[in-house]
A protein has these predicted regions:
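Short, Lys/Arg-rich flexible segments
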Residues: 1-171
Length: 171
């Protein structure tokens, strides 16, 4: 004959009640996830790599020329690049203009107790992330390659799981 005794059943019920209450309001965990994803996405501008680690397409010669035109001393009198201009051109990463507007406007917003959105409010953020062709967008001066910054990397996924696990367990 098997005899089953209940020991600590109240504690189990209490822990389960706390777990259910935490699941009803995930906003603290989502806020932490949002903050971490914002930093991760901003970091992609420094590395010039997509969430999967692939490098972004380099700047076009037209972009480099326009960028160098912002600075005095980029060109010699004969029109060739000065040493300073060469250094500027070599160090220019995609999406890192003088204002750094795109990377500095990445933010998160809690939409509800179970949803967080992360991105940039800038109109051109989607074009930067997904790219576009003149065929689909006739107003473009040329095709724009995708330079994915918005997304979740493997490291981000692991971090999200850790945050959710810690939050649900009350750690």
């Amino acid at each position: 004959m098997i005899n089953i005794e209940q020991r600590g059943a109240r504690q189990v019920v209490l822990v389960l009640d706390q777990l259910v209450a935490r699941m009803d309001d995930m906003s603290p965990a989502l806020a932490e996830i949002g903050e971490d994803l914002v930093e991760s996405m901003k970091g992609r501008f420094a590395s010039a790599k997509a969430p999967d680690g692939t490098p972004w397409a380099p700047n076009s010669p037209v972009t480099i020329t326009a960028y160098l035109g912002l600075f005095k001393g980029s060109h010699k009198k004969d029109g060739s690049l000065s040493k300073k201009g060469q250094q500027r051109a070599a160090s220019k990463k995609p999406g890192t203009g003088e204002t750094k507007a795109l990377q500095t406007t990445i933010n998160y917003q809690l939409e509800s107790n179970d949803t967080v959105s992360v991105g940039s409010p800038l109109v051109y953020a989607a074009m930067f992330n997904f790219g576009g062709t003149r065929e689909k967008f006739p107003n473009l001066w040329g095709d724009i390659p995708a330079r994915e910054f918005a997304g979740v990397s493997d490291a981000d996924r692991e971090n999200i799981l850790e945050i959710v696990g810690s939050y649900l367990l009350g750690a």
